[in-house]
Amino acid sequence: MIQTQTRLAVADNSGAKELMCIKVLGGSGRKTANIGDVIVCSVKSATPGGVVKKGQVVKAVVVRTVSGVRRNDGSYIRFDENAAVVIKDDQSPRGTRIFGPVARELRDKDFMKIISLAPEVI
C-alpha cells in the first residue's frame, strides 16, 4: 500500500533514484495505491545527466510493494521494497530498461511495455 509521503525506489533508468508519492490517481479521495496503480511523485534524488531531474513532478506506476497483493488462487506476492517506474502521459515508460522483478498484475492494467522490458515477471 502506497500513500502520500511514501518514498519509493525507482526500477528503471530514467535518471531518478528515489520518488515520493504526492497523490494517488483514480477516484475522488482515494488514499492508497497498490501494484499497477498510477501515482504522482516528486523526484527526491536523481543521477546527473538523467532524463528526470531532482524536484521534478512525474507520474509513475507502482511495480513492487512490501505489503504485496492477493491473487485469485489465494496466494500472496510480496516484495522487499516499494518500487515504481516513471511513465509518460501515454502510459509508456520514460526509461529504456527495467530493473528487478515486476508483478504479473501489470498485465491486467495494460502496462505491456513494462512487462516486455522487465527481466522477470512474477
From Swiss-Prot:
The alphabetical list of record keywords is:
Ribonucleoprotein, Ribosomal protein, RNA-binding, rRNA-binding
GO cellular-component term (any): cytosolic large ribosomal subunit
What the entry lists under CDD domains is as follows: Ribosomal_uL14 (cd00337)
GO biological process, alphabetically ordered: translation
Q: List the disulfide bonds.
A: none
Q: Which Gene3D superfamilies match?
A: Ribosomal protein L14
Please indicate if the UniProt record lists RNA-binding as a keyword. yes
A Pfam family the protein falls into:
Ribosomal_L14
The answer to whether UniProt assigns keyword rRNA-binding to this entry is: yes
Q: Which GO terms describe its molecular function?
A: large ribosomal subunit rRNA binding; structural constituent of ribosome
Q: Which residues form a coiled coil?
A: none
* Summary of the function given for this chain in its UniProt record: Binds to 23S rRNA. Forms part of two intersubunit bridges in the 70S ribosome.
Q: Hey, which family's this protein in?
A: Belongs to the universal ribosomal protein uL14 family.
- Share what the entry says about its subunit structure, partners included: Part of the 50S ribosomal subunit. Forms a cluster with proteins L3 and L19. In the 70S ribosome, L14 and L19 interact and together make contacts with the 16S rRNA in bridges B5 and B8.
* Listed name of the protein: Large ribosomal subunit protein uL14
Organism phylogeny: Bacteria, Bacillati, Bacillota, Bacilli, Bacillales
